[in-house]
A protein has these predicted regions:
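Short acidic loop-to-helix transition motifs that present clustered carboxylates
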Residues: 52, 62, 90-91, 275, ...
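Short gly/ser/thr-rich secondary-structure transition/capping motifs
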Residues: 37-43, 249-251, 296, 357
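Alpha-helix capping and helix-loop boundary segments enriched in small/acidic/polar residues
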Residues: 46, 61-68, 146-149, 310, ...
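Conserved beta-strand position immediately N-terminal to the Walker
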Residues: 56, 266, 355
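Conserved ATP-driven motor cores of ASCE-family P-loop NTPases powering translocation/secretion/packaging/pilus
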Residues: 72-75, 99, 335-429
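P-loop NTPase motor domains
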Residues: 74-82, 86-345, 349-352, 406-419
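Basic- and hydrophobic-enriched, low-structure N-terminal and domain-boundary segments
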Residues: 1-61, 68-73, 308-310, 328
Length: 430
């Protein structure tokens, strides 16, 4: 038993002390030191960078070291592999990126904070000017003339994104679909009845959508009271996206160049977005454009499908906002979650790795657990979370008991390269 000054703990289950087999010339990340019985060894755990293209799930309750673990990966990646971080809350990645940019002026990380024009550096208290982020939901990822515009597939994804972010009932989802198709057939933004011209046919905007509401509702020939209610519902949802800085970001013709977002190190922070529904919408929109950018590059032959390496990594913090587990098949949220589930399955072929971060793994869609080849867990305390992640990682019941007792910075990791699991102390990022 414990006495003052001396603590007694149960014997720790054993985890592997064997390193992963890595080709000497392969790029890898010095992840941290292996632990034996909770004590740090001199054995360094190295994680192959190319393995990240097979997706990663990182879980752990608040304050256990998840952000530090991600930053340890990004510090190494930034030398050769671009990345995108979508941060819905807090500003830890912004502060990290600012310090990184001071040390690496030749390879700076782009920082976007919608709703914020200047950010105070917490080290020297100076204001840093923040470039505006522009994202037109109706924009088409059309990189070169030889590529197909693929407007119909964009519309299908966009209507799912709208429906999931702004709950709509009865006939409203159908009206929203009609509205989206209508704005793509305007005289100046006609992508459907005429052949669009590369670089000349402009995408619709939220203003176009507002102007089309009356036309779409009138064509349905509802009685006056119903027509009035339908117009009010649609206009309320559209107008909410046109107000203030949201309008500056979304109600625009031209989006921020895709290469700025998806070809260079980039952090998008959504902490100034107060509404959770808006955060989910913005995150879904960014991921939708990311997927379309990957498919566009593939159409142009810019992706080597024989190369299984990681060409780009996307970190999705609070992943449940776009991949929430939903058991009701009729809800739009379920369809949206399935869209991103399919994206998770397909995007790996383009060399795109997804790093999903969440405090509660059981609230994510099943594919977030099943379809990630790297699983990292920090401390979890709920029994159902420990069981779900433990079974997915293939650890036994005795090993699972250590998950609620992990100290800050400690984690258990399993990968597709080994049948063993490793207990690691992740090195602290400066």
């Amino acid at each position: 038993r414990s006495v003052p000054g001396i603590s007694v703990i149960d014997s720790s289950p054993e985890f592997s002390l064997n390193q992963l087999e890595i080709i000497p010339e392969e790029n890898s990340i010095d992840f941290g030191k292996l632990l034996y019985g909770g004590s740090e060894t001199e054995i360094t755990y190295k994680l192959p960078v190319n393995l990240l293209s097979k997706h990663t799930l990182l879980s752990g309750i608040n304050g256990t070291g998840k952000t530090n673990t991600v930053q340890a990966i990004l510090n190494k990646l930034s030398e050769k592999v671009p990345f995108l971080v979508i941060e819905p809350a807090k500003t830890e990645y912004i502060d990290w990126a600012i310090e990184y940019n001071k040390r690496h002026p030749d390879n700076v990380i782009s920082i976007f904070i919608p709703g914020c024009k200047s950010y105070k550096d917490k080290t020297n208290r100076q204001d840093i000017k923040i470039a505006p982020l522009k994202l037109n939901p109706f924009d088409i990822v059309w990189l070169e003339k030889e590529q197909e515009s693929n407007v119909l597939t964009h519309i299908d994804r966009l209507k799912s994104t709208f429906a999931a972010a702004f709950p709509m009932y009865d006939i409203l989802p159908v009206l929203m679909e009609d509205l989206i198709y209508t704005v793509y057939q305007n005289n100046t933004t006609d992508w459907l009845t005429k052949e669009p011209v590369f670089g000349r046919t402009l995408p619709p905007t939220l203003n176009s959508m507002s102007l089309a509401v009356n036309e779409v509702i009138a064509n349905r020939q509802y009685e006056e009271r119903v027509e009035r209610n339908m117009k009010a519902c649609l206009n309320t949802r559209i107008d909410s996206l046109k107000r203030g800085w949201k309008g500056e970001m979304l109600n625009t013709i031209y989006s921020t160049p895709w290469s700025e977002l998806f070809e260079k190190p980039c952090v998008i922070n959504l902490s100034y977005v107060g509404d959770d529904t808006d955060k989910s919408f913005f995150m879904a929109l960014i991921l939708q454009f990311l997927y379309e950018y990957c498919t566009a590059k593939a159409e142009l032959g810019l992706i080597d499908f024989n190369d299984n390496g990681c060409k780009h990594l996307t970190v999705v913090e609070e992943a449940h906002r776009v991949m929430m587990k939903c058991d009701n098949l009729e809800l739009p949220q379920y369809k949206s979650a399935m869209m991103f589930s399919n994206m998770l399955s397909e995007i790996r072929a383009y060399g795109e790795g997804m790093l999903l971060v969440d405090q509660v793994p059981t609230r994510l869609i099943p594919d977030a657990i099943k379809n990630t080849n790297i699983k990292i867990t920090h401390r979890l305390v709920a029994e159902d979370d420990c069981k779900a992640i433990g079974e997915a990682m293939g650890i036994n019941k005795e090993q699972r008991k250590i998950i609620p007792k992990l100290l800050v910075g400690q984690c258990i990791i399993s990968t597709a390269l080994s049948t063993d699991e490793h207990w690691i102390k992740v090195k602290k990022v400066k």
